[in-house]
């Protein structure tokens, strides 16, 4: 792959933090209030707040990096003229938010854009170009006021404290989180995986926010997370944070834009991957 021209990493990180915490303040101010629902289906919903938070994030990014592309859950993909793309999930855990469960976050990351060379597992944008490494990645959980930040080769941090994972020896010492989707074969897949995890892990949980599930692994709270049926904006920022903390992230695009993800403590990855059928 060709290398993208240099960008001011400190400025990117600062804007990512500003965008994420600004959206988080909007969430915190609206949490447990009357909410306007824009769309629903049998297993999901969209709030007007999703769009409001997205507009806030995009506005912050555009003010400083107008030539960068943006891929966001609500607005879709807007390519830029510079070889960088921001990947945004304005509100990850919308259903939790709607029901008053304080487990949700906003996700913002900036990545180099590169020509697609067909590498296995390579994430691609709608225009066919590849998503490269993260320049900066931020997850903000507004109720807990937890700010996760990662930049390449500089590490991952939670509220300023460095995250460094120590390998765990056994699943029996760890909580494993699973995300139960309703589409793409996820129910049948999880019905096979769940009994194996219940038997081997200390506990199994399903918490409802892909990004927070992944950074919980980075923080050492859980040992692993497995999901089938997720999107690039759900995991891009969190995956960068986990990798910089010393964790392992394995992704498979099994259908266009649909991903299976394994996020793990380094000491548990082989066993989790085996159980997950990789």
PLM regions with names:
Residues 81-157:
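DPxDG-like acidic metal-binding loop motif
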Residues 1-14, 115-130, 278:
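Short, low-complexity, intrinsically disordered N-terminal peptides in bacterial proteins
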Residues 1-91:
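N-terminal subdomain of lithium-sensitive/metallo-dependent phosphomonoesterases centered on the IMPase/IPPase/PAP
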Residues 51, 55, 74, 90-93, ...:
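Generic detector of well-ordered alpha-helical packing
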Residues 164-278:
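An extended, acidic
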Residues 16, 20-23, 137, 156, ...:
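Small-residue (primarily alanine) positions within well-ordered alpha-helices
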Residues 23, 27, 50, 61, ...:
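Residue-level signal for inorganic ion chemistry
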């Amino acid at each position: 792959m060709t290398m993208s021209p240099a960008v001011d990493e400190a400025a990117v990180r600062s804007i990512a933090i500003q965008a994420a915490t600004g959206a988080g303040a909007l969430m915190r101010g609206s949490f447990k209030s009357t909410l306007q629902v824009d769309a629903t289906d049998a297993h999901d919903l969209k709030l007007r707040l999703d769009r409001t938070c997205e507009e806030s994030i995009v506005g912050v990014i555009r003010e400083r990096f107008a030539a960068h592309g943006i891929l966001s859950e609500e607005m879709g993909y807007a390519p830029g003229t510079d070889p960088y793309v921001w990947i945004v999930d304005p509100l990850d855990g919308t259903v939790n938010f709607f029901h008053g469960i304080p487990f949700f976050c906003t996700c913002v990351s900036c990545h180099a854009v590169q020509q697609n060379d067909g590498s296995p597992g390579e994430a691609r944008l709608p225009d066919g170009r590849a998503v490269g490494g993260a320049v900066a990645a931020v997850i903000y959980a507004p109720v807990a006021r937890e700010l996760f930040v990662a930049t390449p080769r500089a590490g991952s941090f939670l509220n300023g404290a460095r995250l460094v994972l120590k390998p765990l020896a056994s699943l029996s010492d760890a909580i494993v989180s699973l995300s139960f989707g309703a589409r793409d074969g996820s129910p049948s897949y999880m019905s096979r995986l769940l009994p194996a995890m219940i038997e081997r892990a200390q506990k199994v949980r399903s918490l409802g926010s892909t990004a927070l599930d992944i950074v919980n692994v980075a923080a050492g709270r859980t040992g692993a997370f497995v999901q089938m049926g997720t999107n690039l904006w759900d995991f891009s920022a969190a995956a960068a944070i986990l990798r910089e903390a010393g964790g392992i992230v394995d992704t498979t695009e099994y259908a266009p834009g649909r991903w299976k993800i394994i996020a793990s403590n380094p000491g548990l990855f082989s066993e989790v991957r085996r159980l997950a059928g990789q």
